[in-house]
Design a protein with these regions (language model features):
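Short acidic/polar active-site loop segments enriched in Thr and Asp
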Residues: 67-69, 101
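Conserved hydrophobic ligand-interaction patch in extracellular adhesion modules
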Residues: 69-77
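Active-/binding-site microenvironments in catalytic and ligand-binding cores
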Residues: 24
């Protein structure tokens, strides 16, 4: 790690184990910043503003008792791609390990009104930049400095206001483990932030998700963000990563120019702007007897593969139920997204209705999932054998043709019949019959099946009655 001596303003390099205590300076970049080459070769022509920032940063760090300062403009050789990649992948940890973080707000005057919802502090550019998100979250304390380098206050003092400005819950600003925030929630924190380089809107989030990946400048925002999501899914099964909405006018699925945008993965953190209140559900929607067949997310040359329960709808559409809900509604609802079959022979799907996702009460989920692929009407008999074959689920958002598979299978073996809204529907094929929904008492500590003649399936709260599994291959 490379640090600046606050007394001599020269560079010094340290191995990780030997790194001394240091302060760190967070700021927004402007023209004329001092670079590593400038400091190493003592070049200051035309860099007066950059050197003033360096000089003042060293002074406030020294006044706080630190012999060393880390400043990104000077401490990273950005002409060295290997060093740059290593630095960006390590930056969250460097901010976390700093003894103190000073945030210099160049657009906030010292004589400004006290920080409030509509003050220069709240409107500072610092709160709109991608890189400053981790610089706010990683350090245990952040001292905010006005444009004359006088102290405005600190993160712990302004925590309620900063939570309103950023949409980040106070607990996470004060050091709560970021792993306790859902993927959708964390991505929403970056939804209104900007970076100079398009790819950096993904790279600036590596530390937020404890992810490391190579930097590929030139892949554009969508490519970088797709790779970030893929890396996240390798270590997490949080399905809120699919709970995003796309702004803009709706595009018909028959519009060939829009096909490449109908992806299961978002193209930008901006799509999570309205997902800040979505949390991962504590208990899976899928009942215990199906947990064993839930496949992990797997990537191959066709895209990604995962298992989701679905509800069959008309017009070749299905609702894919995600194991997430609005905050405080984990026992009441689930988020679902729309998929649509766009193939001629059935089974190839894309994400549709991207401007919304559905909030489905669990009671509705139970009953709807029970009949998702039965299609019984007017009490007529239905042969379920036609649902046994696999179909293909396509996500055309991939650069090639992403493919998904839809398998209504793993039905519960049983005998007898079941009841829906007072009607009895007989089964000619006893091999694939189902359970009725369980009734939960107010304490949610017991569940009672409504059907006789079952095979002794363990009673569980939130039991799915009958399941179709959407094994979704999809790419961004």
């Amino acid at each position: 790690m490379r640090l600046i001596n606050t007394t001599t303003q020269t560079l010094a390099e340290f191995e990780s184990a030997d790194t001394p205590p240091y302060a760190i300076l967070s700021h927004t970049w402007t023209n004329g910043e001092t670079t590593y080459q400038d400091l190493a070769h003592e070049r200051n022509a035309g860099k007066e503003a950059g050197y003033a920032k360096l000089d003042n940063g060293c002074k406030v760090a020294a006044a706080a008792g630190f012999d060393y300062l880390w400043l990104d403009t000077c401490c990273i050789d950005k002409t060295n791609n290997v060093e740059l990649s290593e630095a960006i992948n390590s930056m969250f940890q460097w901010y976390k390990n700093a003894g103190i973080c000073f945030a210099y707000l160049a657009d906030v005057p010292a004589n400004a009104d006290s920080p409030a919802a509509d003050s220069p502090f709240s409107r500072s550019k610092w709160f709109t930049r991608g890189w400053t998100l981790q610089e706010l979250l990683a350090p245990s304390e952040v001292i905010f400095l006005a444009n004359d380098w006088t102290e405005l206050g600190c993160k712990t003092t302004f925590v309620s206001l900063i939570a309103k400005i950023t949409g980040i819950p106070s607990d996470f600003l004060l050091g709560e483990d970021l792993e306790h925030a859902s993927i959708a929630m964390r991505l929403s924190w970056a939804s209104c932030r900007k970076t100079t380089k398009a790819e950096d809107i993904a790279y600036c989030l590596l530390g937020i998700f404890d992810i490391q990946m190579p930097l590929l400048y030139g892949e554009r925002e969508a490519g970088a963000f797709r790779r970030l999501q893929q890396e996240i899914m390798k270590t997490s099964d949080d399905q809120s990563i699919f709970a995003w909405m796309k702004d803009g006018p709706h595009k018909s699925i028959n519009d060939s120019s829009a096909r490449q945008t109908f992806s299961l993965l978002a193209h930008s953190p901006a799509s999570f702007k309205k997902s800040g209140n979505i949390v991962e559900a504590e208990a899976p929607v899928v009942s215990g007897y199906l947990d064993g067949i839930r496949t992990p997310t797997v990537f191959n040359n066709k895209g990604l593969h995962l298992s989701l329960p679905i509800i069959q709808k008309k017009d070749r559409r299905v609702l894919a139920i995600l194991n997430c809900s609005d905050l405080g509604q984990e026992t009441e609802q689930r988020i679902a997204i729309w998929l649509c079959d766009v193939s001629t022979n059935g089974g190839r799907y894309i994400r549709v209705e991207r401007q919304k996702f559905e909030r489905i009460p669990l009671s509705t989920v139970f009953m709807s999932a029970m009949y998702s692929s039965i299609s019984a009407t007017k009490g007529e008999d239905e042969d379920l054998d036609r649902f046994r074959g696999p179909t293909t689920l396509q996500d055309t958002g991939h650069r090639g043709n992403g493919v998904s598979r839809l398998r209504p299978e793993h039905m519960v073996r049983s005998s007898g019949s079941f009841r829906k809204m007072g009607r009895r529907i007989s089964k000619r094929n006893p091999k694939y019959t189902t359970y009725e929904p369980v009734v939960r008492n107010e304490s949610m500590s017991e569940s009672t099946p409504l059907m006789e003649g079952s095979t002794g399936l363990p009673h569980r709260p939130f039991m799915f009655i009958r399941e179709s599994l959407a094994e979704c291959f999809g790419c961004g």
